[in-house]
Amino acid sequence: MDNDFILVLDLGGPQAVEMARKLRNQRYYTEIMSRGADEELFRRKAPRGILVVGGDGYSEPFPKAALALGVPVLALGGAARRMIETCGAVSEGILLKEQASQITFKPCPLFDQLSESDRYFARVDGFALPEGFVSIATTLEGFSPAYADLERRLYGLQFYAESNDPDGAVILSNFAEKICGCTPIWTAKDFLEEEVRYIRERVGNGSALMAVSGGVDSTTCALLMHRAIGERVTCVFVDTGLLRSGEAEQVRNTFEGELGLKLISVDAGDRMLNRLRGVIEPTEKRQVIYEEYMKILAEVGREHPEAEYFVEGTIYSDLLARGSSDAVYARRFDPGKRLEPIRMLFKDEVRILGELLGLPRALAARQSFPGPGLAVRCMGEVTESKLALLRRADAIFREEIQLAGQDKKLTRYFAILDDTRTVGRRLGVTTREYACVLRAVGEQGLASYTVGKLPYDMLERAAARIIREVPGINRVTYDISPCENTFVEWQ
């Protein structure tokens, strides 16, 4: 993309991903950088402009390196307050908090095509503006939620472009194109053509192994590699024994049959369960599974010395969650021989790319599944008997969701097996069996989701079926914990 892009600087919070995706949806390429970056890194990246977001509730100062680069800067939310204070403004306290007000935009290239609208403000502070800055918008009460140094092209808005917000989309587009001079050229089709060329140049006449799970990310990446180098890529599927009901067979059938890709399948169920014996803590579970998985990939790599490259289906959210550009890879492979073709794509972009590559519709709609699999949905020690209960309960819940047509409203829905045993009754006999928890969410971003408001009669049917058809579970609950306090997964 050369330097025709906007750098999104994350000061903390979920907004960086949301704003970056909004710009990409308008075909402007973006990259995200975490707070703490130095001026030299900014200069190496050489973006056309910098969007600084987040910082609400965080104590980190505004990065002066962003101001020193000499390119346009747009700061949103808490970052706007940090920027103006860094430039010498004096705070006059909070003027508005958690309320809506009408906003009028003054003549400014950032607000071309806009005049006034109603907007929700989480917080608006008053400032005695420093030299060079002027107010560029006012609320109905006469407050200034936006200001700018037009000569230095520094803009601060104490609000965000919210969901389904046409004015916010216009502001971001104006910043990218009219102020920064970016061109809206980012599309999945252009990415596909460019990445195929890059892979062919990088791999040359070599061959590659690629770890696949059957999910959207790794399958799309495998199809991309196959488009680039054909039969010289071999997929490696490790059946950890921690997949949902019927998934291992589905993965093998899809890759070898429907997609016609070369596949090495490794049955590692017993091996993984042996390593997990006695492990209860979630962090330790993840570490054990990761270590064993990487050992298996390294073994496959040693058995295929002709494969010079190792490929992973890492996507952008994986990269951001790690806080590093270094991805995991099989230890036999030198880092210079590692490929992550879709590492700069968000999940929705991966799905679009998959469709271009012929990804089966059923796979394109497949919900996200954690890397450690059912181990993180099985509370306490993971055993084969507990996994069997969880698989059956999960399959019933997913079937009821789909029969009720609720799957189109949700991004993830699954069962969790609690380690608690409760008193119940089965065939007139008192029992002590496991409790099962159902979870359904609609994700809106990297750290934001809504709890699925499922019809009560559907939940009743699912609960009744699970208790009746899965001996070993005698109690079913539905988790409605909000994202402000919990994660989607329990572990």
Which stretches of residues belong to each language-model region?
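Extended catalytic-interface subdomain
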Residues: 312-314
